[in-house]
């Protein structure tokens, strides 16, 4: 007899988020959102050892390479407030991946505008039956390459 295994919501979203982030197991990752602790433990279980949640990450100093944001059952307006301070934790070459509930195209446009308003350039996205994710990188990368 084959037993069906229920996959927790955190596991369903972690694979597409990691695929968009393209992060190694050594990169520093900050996790935000209502289920950030659950995602942090799942990342630890998968071998990502340098992961923190927004509740235990210290002061913002551009120390994280990737921010994974679980924004299910929350508004884009509330995301804008979180992005106000979250981007300060990212390195100049940092990347943000935001997971949201399934929404209408207008909601996706609002998400894109919110990311762009915080100095992020949308790079890629994925749509699944239980939500979608968008990755965006900091625009500071271009200024670094000009200096070099």
Task: Give the residues covered by each predicted segment.
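A short glycine-rich, Lys/Arg-flanked "PGG" loop and its adjoining helix->strand segment in the class I
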Residues: 78-95
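Conserved class I S-adenosyl-L-methionine
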Residues: 24-36
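Class I S-adenosyl-L-methionine
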Residues: 107-148
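A short, well-structured beta->alpha microelement
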Residues: 12, 17, 35, 40-62
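A short SAM/SAH-binding and catalytic strip from SAM-dependent methyltransferases
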Residues: 64-80
